[in-house]
Amino acid sequence: MYTNLIFIFKIILEGIIEGVTEFLPVSSTGHMIILGSIIGFKEGAKPVSLYGAEYIHMFEIIIQLGAILAIVVLYWDKIFSALKPSNLFPSMKEHEKSGIGVVGEFFVKGYNTMPGFKFWTNIVVACIPAIVIGLPFQKKIDKLLFFPAPVAAALMVGAVWMIFAENKYRKRAKIKSVDEITIKQAIVIGCFQCLALWPGMSRSASTIIGAWIVGVATVAGAEFSFFLAIPMMLGASLLFLIKNSVVLSSVQILGLAVGFIVAFIVALVVVDRFISFLKKKPMRIFAVYRLAIGIIVLVLGFTKVIS
């Protein structure tokens, strides 16, 4: 009984950290490494080894889904509107002789006249770079870089880059809405998202910086980052669940449910306040925080507290 209570307590802590950090430009990975090492909730840690590495991976997937659900709830009107057939499919009553064919005309007309078509097209093309690089190389990247020193380096490099990019590009950014983002800008932002394959860099930070560089304002860049997370995380979760089957005990199932709910509720609050913050304040405070966390990860790694 006592062991189960301790387990649920650890689950709650993990859910809170996931909900707080998943969509902030501070790297949820860095925080999960620190917390997991301290409380013994990581692969190979004795208190959790009873539950197995597969369960830990599944738990990480499930709490990410909780955070994703928060985005779906907060932006339901936008997502639902973009899925309406009236906003998604252009009318092609007449075939115009444009030299690009029916399919080309359908795409061009849809992109230029249908908000939903444009929205999902931008999301899809922005996801392609990370899929192309991530699918074949993610395991190799993690094997090389999923250690305290590389994660700390990513945290600190990202912090310096964030300060530089904000000072140079933020004031130039004129695109204030996700609906104004062009397909070229979406592709570039998607390429920047690939930097998050380096553990500790932060997908949110990478995409927001990429958005600044191509002229997209902070709030629009952050929201586009949120929308990108939906297919990326759902896809990664589905892939993991297809490849792995785990027989769960009642306590393990309870742990998944609690972690999911905690991550959902915390992310719901954090994302809403994060957007309000970005409307008024610069992001350098997150850069300073990243530097501090990077130093902590380095020290803990050097002293063998985390590994």
UniProtKB/Swiss-Prot annotation:
Name listed for the protein in its UniProt record? Undecaprenyl-diphosphatase 2
What topology does it adopt in the membrane?
Multi-pass membrane protein
Leader sequence segment: none
In terms of InterPro entries, this protein maps to: UppP
Membrane among keywords: yes
Q: Which residues cross the membrane?
A: 19-41, 56-76, 117-137, 144-164, 208-228, 229-249, 251-271, 285-305
Under catalytic activity, the entry for this protein gives: di-trans,octa-cis-undecaprenyl diphosphate + H2O = di-trans,octa-cis-undecaprenyl phosphate + phosphate + H(+)
Q: Which gene encodes it?
A: uppP2
Q: What family does the database annotate?
A: Belongs to the UppP family.
Cellular localization per UniProt: Cell membrane
Q: Which GO terms describe its molecular function?
A: undecaprenyl-diphosphatase activity
Q: What more does the entry say?
A: Bacitracin is thought to be involved in the inhibition of peptidoglycan synthesis by sequestering undecaprenyl diphosphate, thereby reducing the pool of lipid carrier available.
* Native organism taxonomy: Bacteria, Bacillati, Bacillota, Clostridia, Eubacteriales
